[in-house]
Amino acid sequence: EYTRALGNVDNVNPNMHYKTYTTNPDNVNSEILNIPLWLLGVDDLALLLDVTTPNQLPIIEKALSLVSILTGDDPDVIKYKNDIIARAVLDILLSGHQSTKIRDQVIAVLTKFNTKDLSLDAKIVQPGYVRTFKQCLYIDKTGKLMEMELVVNFVKTFIMDDFNLEDRPEKFIAYTLKDLETAMDFALISEGILKSDKVYDYANVLSVRLHALANSPNHVFFDSNAYISKDTYLDRL
C-alpha cells in the first residue's frame, strides 16, 4: 500500500525519496534489513540474546572487548589466546578440587580451546624425556596429579602479566556472528564458567543463543563484510 502510494514520489519531487526495508528475503521490492554487528553495544546484544540477569552483562562486555583482539590481523592474537586459556586452566589447576575433576575440566577446556603452543598435545620437555601435556595429567594410585607443579609452571609461561584489555586502544573492525561467538566462548572461560554450576547455568545460555542465531537464517540481518562507521550507515539508510 505504501509502496503504491509513495514509490514514485521522486518523480513528483526530486528532493523526496522512498525506500523500504524488510526482513522477508522473498520480498524483491525492498532492501533486506542489515545491521552491522559492531554497531551494537552491550544493551543491544542483551536484548538480542534475551538476557535475564545482570550477571550476564559483564560476559557480553568481555566478549565485545575480546572480539577486536581475536579477529583481524593483530600479530599477537595467539599470545592473547594463550593468555586467556592459560588463566582459565590455571584457575582449574589451583581450585583445590579432586584430582579427577581437575583433570577432566582441564581436558575439557583444552579440547575446545587450544593453540599450537598450548594444547593437550603440547610438548613439555624435561631433561631426558618429553611428554605431552595430557600425559602429565596422570593421576597416581593415591589420587594425586603426579606432575601438578610441572603442569602449573608450564601453564604460567603463557600468562602475560602486562596484558590488560582496558589499556588497549579501541579498534574499529568488521566482524561476524561467528567471530563474536568465538569471543563469547573465550569470555566465558575467562569468567570462570567451569568453576561454578551456578555461573555455568546463566553464562552458557548466552553462548547457546548466540550459536543458534549464527546458524539460523536470521544471520543475514547481521552479515557485513566490510567495516562501516555508524555515521556512514545512518547516511545510507
Predicted segment positions?
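P-loop NTPase motor domains
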Residues: 2-11, 25, 33-237
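Conserved beta-strand scaffold positions in the cores of enzyme catalytic domains, especially
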Residues: 15-22, 34
